[in-house]
């Protein structure tokens, strides 16, 4: 079962609490169209993007070990995050721009090279899997200790 992080965020329009499920988030970025640069969250199950007050950097702190990659938008160098579960392909186009393709026909033009994106994905996978392995080891040791206690 995929590990899930629930984020407590605040809606941009009225500051009310919004709870987001990390496994449903495709990407997070700052809306370049908005004057106040609100953060936008796009989810897999819902076509509607949500605007929140928290910055992508602040959100990334909570999602770093949950399979998210941090990169920078080419047009304004703002931070963008994407979930590696929704990653499809990354390549350089004819103009030399790096394009990241995600599920739901989402394209991101970023400053990082495809090699850098690849390394970031591997690092995100490693962090994600390491925590799963550590949790499994702890569960096994706890179960072994419980079994020993029952035998005694």
Task: Please give the residue ranges for each predicted region.
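Eukaryotic intrinsically disordered, low-complexity regulatory linkers and tails enriched in Ser/Thr/Pro
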Residues: 1-152
